[in-house]
Each structure stands twice: as C-alpha cells, then as structure tokens.
Amino acid sequence: MTEYKLVVVGAGGVGKSALTIQLIQNHFVDEYDPTIEDSYRKQVVIDGETCLLDILDTAGQEEYSAMRDQYMRTGEGFLCVFAINNTKSFEDIHQYREQIKRVKDSDDVPMVLVGNKCDLAARTVESRQAQDLARSYGIPYIETSAKTRQGVEDAFYTLVREIRQHKLRKLNPPDESGPGCMSCKCVLS
C-alpha cells in the first residue's frame, strides 16, 4: 500500500487542525487550541488505489517556525491553507511556499492552495484572488469548510493526485535527446 506524507501549513487560526480532524474523524472542532505538531494516519481509497495518508498538522504560530524546515524536508506534498476571512493569512502563503521550495531545493513540489472557512459570509479574500495566485504557482485551488466538510476530502485527495503526477514526472522526464540537445555528453560504460 502506498503511503503519502502530507503536510498542512498556514498561519495560526486558519483551521489546519479542524480540516485534518474533519478528514480523519468526521467531526468539527470549534474550540481553538494552537497546535505544536500533530500526526494523523488514515487509510483511504483514491481513484481505486488504497493508500495510507500520513498527515502532519503543523504549528502556524511564529514561535514554532524553527520546526518548519524539519517537517518540510520529510513531506511529499503540502496543503497551503489560509482563511478566506483573514487577508494576512492569504498574504503569508507566499512565505510558506518559498520556504518549502528552499528546503526541498526544488520549484516542483506538490502543493494545493486551500481557502478555508468558506461557510463564513465575512470574506476578505475573493475566490478570484486565490485562483489567480494558484494559477501563478501552477497549483490547484480548493475552497473548504472544516465546519460543513465542504471540499475537505477534495483538498487532501487532490494533493495525493498532485504527488502521484509529480512521481510520474520524475520517472518519465521530458525527452531531452531531441534535436535541441546538442550539448549532451553521454558516457556509456
């Protein structure tokens, strides 16, 4: 059975734990208890494949930022979560993405942008803004509500699909032996 290491990142209070617990335990946690780091495992079937999700729910608080490099190193894919009623959390996404790219030493890291709390009327981040940001990053955007469960499975399952595609790209890189590759120096031994 394939195991996927998913990491949930984002500013404090955006609902990272609520999303994760909604996926794992099917219930909404409405009291806010800042996370340091929690790990969850769940067996699911995605596109006919049984797989094990190993989900790391991380601290959004700045005082735990030193721990980020470690979990970013081990994660295969990242849910970058902001709250649609918190513009600052949306603006913070850029720093999380840059840190992930730096730690992974790659521009090609599986990620999904997640706008949480879409059940709330007091929206300060428009869907269009988030879609534009996701498009500029070349990643999917999904709106979720940990409270109503809307989009929760979709967000995590989409990330698994992104990881699968990433692995396929690494196994089958674009053909570089075409006419544009005159500087290749192949050594056969």
Curated annotation (Swiss-Prot):
Where is this chain lipid-modified, annotation S-farnesyl cysteine?
Answer: C186
Q: Which domain of life is it from?
A: Eukaryota
Where does the record put the Glycyl lysine isopeptide (Lys-Gly) (interchain with G-Cter in ubiquitin) cross-link? K170
Q: What is the effect of changing Q61R?
A: Promotes interaction with SHOC2 and PP1C
Can you summarize the PTM annotation of this record?
Palmitoylated by the ZDHHC9-GOLGA7 complex. A continuous cycle of de- and re-palmitoylation regulates rapid exchange between plasma membrane and Golgi. S-nitrosylated; critical for redox regulation. Important for stimulating guanine nucleotide exchange. No structural perturbation on nitrosylation.
Q: Which GO terms describe its molecular function?
A: G protein activity; GDP binding; GTP binding; GTPase activity; phospholipase C activator activity; protein-membrane adaptor activity
Keyword Nucleotide-binding annotated: yes
- Where would you say this protein principally sits, based on its record? membrane
Among SMART domains, the record links this protein to: RAB, RAS, RHO
Q: Which residues form a coiled coil?
A: none
Q: What is the effect of changing C118S?
A: Abolishes S-nitrosylation. No stimulation of guanine nucleotide exchange
Q: What NCBIfam families does its record include?
A: small_GTP
Disease involvement: Costello syndrome: A rare condition characterized by prenatally increased growth, postnatal growth deficiency, intellectual disability, distinctive facial appearance, cardiovascular abnormalities (typically pulmonic stenosis, hypertrophic cardiomyopathy and/or atrial tachycardia), tumor predisposition, skin and musculoskeletal abnormalities.
Query: What protein name is recorded for this chain?
Result: GTPase HRas
Q: Which organism is it from?
A: Homo sapiens
Q: What is the lineage of its organism?
A: Eukaryota, Metazoa, Chordata, Craniata, Vertebrata
State the gene name recorded for this protein: HRAS
